[in-house]
A protein has these predicted regions:
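Residue-level signature of catalytic and energy-coupling elements of molecular machines
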Residues: 12, 30, 66, 99, ...
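Phosphate-binding loop that captures ATP/GTP phosphates
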Residues: 125-191, 197
Length: 345
């Protein structure tokens, strides 16, 4: 039996690309380079993206189909060659080359206002005239779409330099991306660690962030695979830790670990004191006084700022209007002061 290209194409036409209903030939995935020598054959398959999740299974199915239709005496020379239309994502360490400073916003535990700090710090930096991007890396509990009042936004992709790039949403002078834009807000995100990390890498490496002075990453509370993904994927400038005193040590120790080695830019004491609206000059230290200052001295890191408990912070966050937008308020001034302290670091 003689082999010729049409027999190979007929075999490949029985393999369908998942989710499209088209076979490999119809989908234009078989390059016109089929090479045959006796019973030896080699050819190339074309995929849209280098990260195509079906690449391995499709290649295996193509190989099996040829052997099934043309006989096991057929030898596929080497591996089936794979080519991609979309350019490959840059290597780790070369991502975001146009970003000057990459800062993680972290906390040792949840419920300390880390995301509030991240959102308002981003807005405050933008008000100071800097180009700012904010990535909501809290994959399992994204909050930035609500805090910026862009819950209905759906980022789209554009072809840039041969790659499909996600265009970040812009609000209050901040470029913003969150997994919350791509999932149903009423459904739990039931992903294993690897899936979450891959989604995060896409939001970092497959997005058109452009030139930025500051790229802030709102990390999940505690320590997790997401934190490791970020520090292994990006050249971090440093981290800002929102303080819940006992757990802040864990966050600091994670970043200063020899395997991670990300500088701590400083601490932010959120909920430092309570000031009621009717008594704006009063401060009630309901969680104790100077705890963050003592921790900063103990850990030899700066105390970048103190944010009071004020009803408007929560209310404005729920409305999607960060308090840092209004520099005439006590909280607005507090976040602008924090932004200036971060810049000095």
């Amino acid at each position: 039996m003689a082999l010729y290209p049409k027999l190979i194409l007929d075999a490949l036409a029985t393999v369908r690309y998942p989710g499209t209903g088209k076979n490999l030939v119809e989908a234009g995935m078989v390059e016109d380079d089929i090479r045959i020598e006796g019973m030896k054959v080699s050819f190339s398959l074309i995929f849209e993206k280098p990260t195509d999740p079906f690449m391995k299974s499709v290649v295996k199915a193509a190989e099996t189909s040829i052997l099934t239709h043309e006989g096991k005496e057929v030898e596929i020379v080497g591996n089936i060659s794979v080519k991609t239309v979309q350019a490959a994502r840059p290597e780790v360490g070369k991502l975001l080359p146009q970003v000057k400073n990459i800062i993680g916003i972290s906390s040792g535990k949840g419920g300390v206002g880390k995301s509030t700090v991240a959102a308002n710090l981003a807005v405050a930096l933008a008000k100071l005239g800097y180009k700012v991007g904010l990535l909501d890396a809290d994959i399992f509990g994204p909050s930035m779409p609500k805090m910026f009042q862009v819950e209905d936004a759906r980022p789209y992709a554009e072809k840039i330099d041969g790659r499909d790039m996600i265009i970040p949403v812009e609000k209050y002078g901040v470029k913003l991306l969150s997994i919350g834009f791509f999932v149903d807000p009423d459904q739990a995100t039931l992903w294993r660690g690897g899936m979450a990390s891959n989604a995060l890498k896409q939001l970092i490496g497959d997005a058109a962030w452009g030139e930025l002075d500051y790229f802030l990453i709102d990390l999940p509370p505690g320590t997790s695979d997401i934190h490791l993904t970020v520090v292994q994927t990006l050249a971090m400038t440093g981290a800002v830790v929102a303080v819940a005193l006992a757990d802040a040590r864990k966050g600091i120790n994670m970043f200063t670990n020899d395997k991670v080695n990300v500088p701590i830019l400083g601490l932010v004491e959120n909920m430092a004191w309570f000031t009621p609206a009717e008594l704006p000059d009063n401060k009630y230290y309901i969680f104790g006084r100077e705890g963050a200052k003592k921790l900063a001295e103990e850990m030899n890191v700066p105390l970048l700022g103190q944010i009071p408990i004020v009803q408007s912070i929560c209310e404005n966050g729920d409305k999607g209007t960060p308090v840092a937008l209004d520099e005439n308020t006590m909280t607005g001034r507090a976040f602008l002061s924090l932004a200036a302290a971060v810049v000095r670091q």
